[in-house]
């Protein structure tokens, strides 16, 4: 990325080489040298400087942006866009959470042009097929019947005695074979034979790899040969399900470093074929090396090749295990670093598991919509919708603290799901939407969706709706408290809860009693509890009496105490 001239503006310090610093804005009212005061212009980062791998504003978002006369912005101007900028004083690159919030509409069309080009030019990568490794993997050219000394290797690997199975003993046997002019054996052919026939444990792999490393500096003088040997080492791990012990991992890392040194390469793996790069990337991911894995993913993207979906899933899982659960914008920033150039990969391969990971990266509803565009181009979009929709519903429900906005987003998602599946949606999906509408206090939508499904079949589900509504305080949700909202909740209680009250569990009845906030509802609860007690069930009459005292309802207090005395 070339150097850009920055106009005076507010500048944030953040990550330098992936290390976050405290975000401190410059004082906009600080006195300048000439005695005047100035404010720094708000500058939106260029599209090329942003690192978001799946968000791209659609036509409607771009139109609204250009039509905004005041405060044009994308993603509601939230500071959630990972971008690389140059610091004003040092010109050092810094990774920060920025806003797509230009100062004015002037020049917006040019600013948006990279988005249009990205959409026009976006094309899937060529997937790395499993059979491509066959161009590197080959059988050893050794005729075992002509070389009886190979039996010594068989005995050595069968015993796996640490004193016998070592790089030095393997190397000495290979030296003797290579020195025999009648046999005319090359060391790499012996290594290939051993890897293909005898290496079935981590100790065996470590010893052979250490021996290969020694021979790099005295006998192996071709990079393609080194690539073939590394590919066979990794194939032996996969084929024999050999666990990666610290010793085996260390030996393979040392081999890769030695190949780079031997052939004067900064990182030899990037010079290998895409199939070997993919195998090596899988080794790094399985070993927990996140930065090295990112380098190799970048190499595959630069070569316009796409790794397997299973490897992408493994890598995203490694990011989660290393970075942990994101609780702040800086936590998200670290994660975005490791998938910054993954857009071509996501355009090529999108699975339910990949989508699950990416949903957790979304902090704005427009990111969800962009993700759904990628899902629509997937060959397995039906499986993605089936498996990920419940998680997506929950994520959308909690994107903001504004319950009205969340409900609008839920409705848009409901409409998209309806267009995909057709109406009516399944009971499972409807129940997922109902729960999240309840979390946001929208009992009008709760009642509407309950009317679609068989309302008599799920009396126990109604208590779950009340429990979900109680969660709004845990999420610091700003639930509506208007007269209409309270009326909708009261209607839900009278039409859904009270008629099925006796069918609800004891815990569910406790929730119903908690939300019986009028004398009319409390009286209905009292009658139901008296009936339950009459049948010998466990009643809530003492709690009803206490609730009635709070409501100052003398009639209910009297009836509850009369029933308790009997």
From Swiss-Prot:
**Leader sequence residues:** none
Do you know which Pfam families this protein is assigned to? Answer: AEP1
Q: One GO CC annotation, please?
A: mitochondrion
**What's in the keyword line of the UniProt record?**
Mitochondrion, Transit peptide, Translation regulation
Q: Name one GO molecular function term.
A: translation regulator activity
The primary location reported for this protein is mitochondrion
- Transit peptide located at 1-13
Compartment(s): Mitochondrion
Record's family?
Belongs to the AEP1 family.
Q: What task does this protein carry out? A: Required for translation of the mitochondrial OLI1 transcript encoding subunit 9 of mitochondrial ATP synthase.
Q: What is this protein called?
A: ATPase expression protein 1, mitochondrial
Organism, scientific name: Lachancea thermotolerans (strain ATCC 56472 / CBS 6340 / NRRL Y-8284)
Gene giving rise to this polypeptide:
AEP1
């Amino acid at each position: 990325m070339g150097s850009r001239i920055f106009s005076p503006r507010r500048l944030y310090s953040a990550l330098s080489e992936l290390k976050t610093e405290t975000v401190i804005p410059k004082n906009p009212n600080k006195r300048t040298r000439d005695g005047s005061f100035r404010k720094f212009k708000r500058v939106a980062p260029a599209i090329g400087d942003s690192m978001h791998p799946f968000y791209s504003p659609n036509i409607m978002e771009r139109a609204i942006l250009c039509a905004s006369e005041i405060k044009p912005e994308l993603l509601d101007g939230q500071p959630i866009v990972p971008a690389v900028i140059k610091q004003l004083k040092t010109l050092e690159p810094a990774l920060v959470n920025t806003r797509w919030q230009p100062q004015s509409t002037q020049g917006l069309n040019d600013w948006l042009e990279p988005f249009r080009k990205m959409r026009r030019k976006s094309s899937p990568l060529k997937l790395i097929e499993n059979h491509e490794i066959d161009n590197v993997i080959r059988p050893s050219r050794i005729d075992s019947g002509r070389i009886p000394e190979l039996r010594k290797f068989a005995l050595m690997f069968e015993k796996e005695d640490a004193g016998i199975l070592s790089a030095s003993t393997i190397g000495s046997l290979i030296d003797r074979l290579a020195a025999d002019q009648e046999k005319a054996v090359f060391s790499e052919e012996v290594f290939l034979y051993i890897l293909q026939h005898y290496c079935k444990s981590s100790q065996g792999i470590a010893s052979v790899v250490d021996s290969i490393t020694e021979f790099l500096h005295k006998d192996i003088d071709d990079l393609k040969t080194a690539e073939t040997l590394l590919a066979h080492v990794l194939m032996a791990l996969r084929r024999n399900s050999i666990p990666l012990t610290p010793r085996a991992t260390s030996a393979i890392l040392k081999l890769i470093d030695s190949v780079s040194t031997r052939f004067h390469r900064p990182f030899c793996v990037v010079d290998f074929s895409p199939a070997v790069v993919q195998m090596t990337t899988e080794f790094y991911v399985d070993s927990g090396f996140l930065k090295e894995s990112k380098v190799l993913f970048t190499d595959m993207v630069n070569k316009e090749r796409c790794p397997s979906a299973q490897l992408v899933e493994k890598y995203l899982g490694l990011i989660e295990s290393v970075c942990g659960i994101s609780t702040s914008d800086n936590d998200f920033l670290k994660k975005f670093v490791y998938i910054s150039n993954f857009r071509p990969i996501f355009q090529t391969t999108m699975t339910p598991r990949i989508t699950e990971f990416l949903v957790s990266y979304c902090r704005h509803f427009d990111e969800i919509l962009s993700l759904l565009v990628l899902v629509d181009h997937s060959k397995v979009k039906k499986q993605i919708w089936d498996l990920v929709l419940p998680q997506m519903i929950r994520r959308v429900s909690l994107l903001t603290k504004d319950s009205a906005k969340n409900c609008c987003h839920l409705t848009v998602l409901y409409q998209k799901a309806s267009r995909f599946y057709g109406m009516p949606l399944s009971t499972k999906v409807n129940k997922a939407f109902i729960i999240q509408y309840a979390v946001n206090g929208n009992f009008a939508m709760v009642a509407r969706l309950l009317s679609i499904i068989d309302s008599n079949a799920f009396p126990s589900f109604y208590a779950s709706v009340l429990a979900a509504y109680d969660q709004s305080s845990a999420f610091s949700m700003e639930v509506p408290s208007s007269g209409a909202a309270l009326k909708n909740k009261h209607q839900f209680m009278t039409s859904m809860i009270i008629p099925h009250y006796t069918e609800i569990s004891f815990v569910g009845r406790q929730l119903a009693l908690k939300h019986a906030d009028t004398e009319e509802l409390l009286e209905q609860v009292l009658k139901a509890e008296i009936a339950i007690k009459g049948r010998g069930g466990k009643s809530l009459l003492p709690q009803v009496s206490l609730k009635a005292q709070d409501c100052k309802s003398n009639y209910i207090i009297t009836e509850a105490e009369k029933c308790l005395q009997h």
